From Swiss-Prot:
Entry-linked Pfam families: DEAD, Helicase_C, PriA_3primeBD, PriA_C, Zn_ribbon_PriA
Domain Helicase ATP-binding: 212-378
Species, as recorded: Haemophilus influenzae (strain ATCC 51907 / DSM 11121 / KW20 / Rd)
Broadest EC class assigned to this enzyme: isomerase
Residues noted as binding Zn(2+) 2 in the record, renumbered to the chain: C446, C449, C464, C467
Positions bound to Zn(2+) 1: C437, C440, C477, C480
Keyword Thylakoid: no
Domain Helicase C-terminal residue range list: 472-640
GO biological process: DNA recombination; DNA replication; DNA replication initiation; DNA replication, synthesis of primer; double-strand break repair
Family matches, as SUPFAM superfamilies: P-loop containing nucleoside triphosphate hydrolases (SSF52540)
E.C. number: 5.6.2.4
Keywords annotated in UniProt: ATP-binding, DNA replication, DNA-binding, Helicase, Hydrolase, Isomerase, Metal-binding, Nucleotide-binding, Primosome, Zinc
Protein name per Swiss-Prot or TrEMBL: Replication restart protein PriA
Length: 730
């Protein structure tokens, strides 16, 4: 009896055995349909063991193979196994993550033909006669078809619209047999680039570019360039060289950095096949791009984090923009980091990774210092951008209106009256709220740890996340006796309403995840900003990077204090990165730019170092501090989270896990917790966490593997999450 071991997308970190009928031929990496309980499930062939732990008479047969050949090349298969091992994830979770949804659901991976919608003569007449005046969306779809055929399922119109038009006889389906051409065949004798759009590199850019070309094979390059220094031009010219060698390129950008203007810049420069992968695509569109990259039809794929799992027939380089950005870390399912996984993939493919940032992560700076990464520096702004002026406003004793001080309002008024735009930036992500005195700046601190208490709104208590101590909310300041105690944090909607009242003659645009959740909203806002229709811009992370706003001359960071006293040791690094990135939005043309920072703590070491000496000086000091405190990147961490409807269930579950690690007596292993998460209740679930830390990555991995294999008592009411190399401790 031939046995096959398969991976399934189920919440169980194990593989499952079936037997293979004699007339069926399988290979590792192919999909099969199997019985699983009372259901039929898609599975992926992972191994052919000689025997099974399941008795032969209990083994079920696979139902049918779904592929003629493996869906994964040997290198990608090896890479995905590495990812599953490192991130302590189920192989099924990882393999299925690497496939488009349509393939996860069992649809065919072979695309021999494509189906299109085409307008009929009746449809053309209907357009002329205006028969669809009452059906605006149908009229739009028909108008679109009058200009070009549209692939079925691979467009922006719903299936209901097409069904209605087909029922009326206005459109028809046509099927075209395809023999896909590679991107080089489609290019023919045309040039790869439009040379008139290629910019002349300055001395620093030319030096960096020549170093890139001099080295071949696997390398990790950190392009460390100040905002506006021309990193994108180096990307484009490097991509041109890769394409000239006949290879493909993957360009990764943060979720919020993938805008139409980013894609347009590539399409204006290159005459090759460019595909885009992002969260707004349909499942059909995602499968289409996956197939094109795998068959060599795509020359360039630009995408967000998950685009990393796109297989290429001949990948030549990976570009990773804004390498420091936290959105490269997956925060649900299995928690991989796209930057780190991209480097492992490049190593296995023997190609280079070019990573760029104006504010590199401290991990990457440390890897440069250790000789693991090559360092390319662009310290000068390209073009005619003028130097910025920086100002700090001390909020103590200021009259504040919803987070806005009088000096800031006066500066805003001055810039707006000159016809310029103003950007106010808020960031609350991952920053735990702390209690402070508005009069003198006193912070409520734990007397045992000398660290700020975290304010827990649901329980209305202060809790120390270093030792677990808690206390009731004080009525007055511990230093000056003032009763004016405030928590850090401010909402974009509150700020929007305040600004509309204070500046009634100017248009206010609020750009955050809520206001841009609908398709096309972000693009509309960005166009309004470019055209000057909005004068006051309120932004979150979305506006911090990548956008060119030539008329923005004043940028203000409204609330930074929570980052200065966060229990997350990375909060200060993120604040420094945000400050530099946000400042890069001001004065990008020939206009003088100003950056204003509001804080109760103008003398905080982070702010004084950052403003006086820049990001590199801050990074150097912070790395020294991390080293002395035994924090990453000099140690390695894993976070185990427990969520349950009852707090004691989550706490007890983590206590059992902590006891397990304690029993192993692992030298050098530090544990913090179990303790409530900084945001201890979310969506009706109580959240607890246990942080593990060790100076050896290998030792920590071994301990985690033993924990995964241990027969610990499970509680179905508790959801456990393991996050290796956590980026967010909240």
């Amino acid at each position: 009896m031939k046995i096959v071991r398969v991976a399934l997308a189920v919440p169980l970190p194990r593989l499952f055995d079936y037997f293979v009928p004699d007339d069926v031929s399988l290979q590792i990496g192919m999909r099969v349909l199997v019985p699983f309980g009372t259901q039929k499930r898609v599975a992926i062939v992972a191994d052919f063991p000689t025997k099974s732990d399941v008795p032969e008479d209990k083994l079920k047969a696979i139902l049918q193979p779904l592929d003629l050949a493996p869906l994964f090349t040997p290198i990608y298969w090896d890479w995905l196994h590495w990812a599953a091992n490192y991130y302590q994830a189920g192989l099924g979770d990882v393999l299925f993550q690497a496939l488009p949804v349509k393939l996860r659901n069992g649809e065919s991976a072979v695309k021999n033909d494509r189906t299109f919608w085409r307008i009929t003569d009746a449809g053309k007449n209907a357009l002329k006669q205006g028969e669809l005046k009452r059906s605006k969306k149908q009229a739009e779809a028909l108008q679109y078809l009058s200009e070009t055929d549209l692939e079925k399922g691979n467009n922006d119109f719903s299936s209901a619209i097409w069904s209605a038009l087909k029922a009326k006889g206005f459109i028809e389906e046509i099927t075209i047999q395809t023999n896909p051409l590679s991107w080089q065949q489609r290019l023919g004798n045309n040039p790869i680039v439009n040379a008139e759009n290629r910019l002349t590199l300055n001395k620093q850019q030319a030096l960096a570019f020549s170093q890139l070309l001099f080295h071949s094979g696997f390398n990790v390059w950190l392009l460390d360039g100040v905002t506006g220094s021309g990193k994108t031009e180096i990307y484009l010219q490097y991509i041109e060289e890769i394409l000239k060698s006949g290879k493909q390129v993957l360009v990764l950008v943060p979720e919020i950095g993938l805008t139409p203007q980013t894609v347009q810049r590539f399409k204006v420069r290159f005459n090759v096949e460019i595909d885009v992968l992002h969260s707004n695509l349909t499942d059909t569109q995602r499968l289409y791009v996956w197939d094109r990259a795998r068959s060599g039809q795509s020359a360039i794929v630009i995408g967000t984090r998950s685009a990393l799992f796109t297989q290429f027939s001949n990948l030549g380089a990976i570009i990773l923009d804004e390498e420091h950005d936290s959105s490269y870390k997956q925060q649900d399912s299995w928690r991989y980091h796209a930057r780190d996984l991209a480097i492992v993939l490049a190593q296995k493919l023997n190609i280079s990774v070019l990573m760029g940032s104006a504010t590199p992560s401290l991990e990457s700076i440390n890897n440069v210092q250790n000789g693991k990464y090559q360092h390319l520096v662009l310290s000068k702004r390209a073009g005619n951008s003028t130097a910025l002026r920086h100002f700090v406003i001390d909020l103590k004793n200021q009259n504040i209106q919803n987070g806005l001080s009088k000096p800031l309002l006066e500066r805003m008024k001055a810039h707006l009256e000159k016809g310029n735009q103003v950007l106010l930036f808020l960031n609350r992500r991952g920053f735990a709220p702390v209690l402070l005195c508005h009069e003198c700046g006193w912070i409520a601190q734990c007397p045992h740890c000398e660290k700020p208490y975290t304010y827990h709104q649901h329980q209305n208590v202060l809790r120390c996340h270093h030792c677990g101590a808690q206390k009731t909310i004080p009525r007055q300041c511990g230093d000056c006796g003032s009763t004016h105690l405030v928590t850090t944090g401010l909402g974009t909607e509150q700020l929007e309403e305040t600004l509309k009242t204070l500046f009634p003659h100017y248009s206010v645009a609020r750009i955050d995840r809520d206001s841009t959740s609908r398709k096309g909203k972000l693009e509309g806002y960005l166009e309004d900003i470019q055209q000057g229709k909005s004068q006051i811009l309120i932004g979150t992370q979305m506006l911090a990077k990548g956008h060119h706003f030539p008329n923005v001359t004043l940028v203000a960071l409204v609330n930074v204090d929570s980052a200065l006293f966060s229990l997350d040791f990375r909060a200060e690094e993120r604040l420094a990165q945000l400050y530099i990135q946000v400042a890069g939005r001001a004065g990008r043309a020939d206009k003088q730019g100003e950056v204003v920072l509001q804080t109760h703590y103008p003398d905080h070491p982070l702010l004084t170092t950052l403003l006086a000496n820049g990001y590199q000086a801050f990074a150097k000091e912070t790395l020294q501090l991390r080293h002395s405190m035994g924090l990453p990147p000099f140690t390695f961490q894993a976070l185990i989270k427990a969520q349950a409807r009852h707090s004691d269930l989550a706490e007890n579950c983590l206590s059992q896990i902590a006891d397990f690690f304690q029993s192993k007596q692992i030298t050098g292993l530090q544990m913090l917790g179990p303790m409530p998460a900084p945001f201890s209740k979310k969506a009706g679930q109580y959240r607890w966490q246990l942080l593990l830390q060790h100076p050896s990555r290998m030792t920590l991995q071994k301990a985690l593997r033993e924990y995964q294999q241990a027969e610990l008592e499970k509680n179905s009411q508790v959801r456990l999450i393991l996050d290796v190399d956590p980026q967010d401790l909240s």
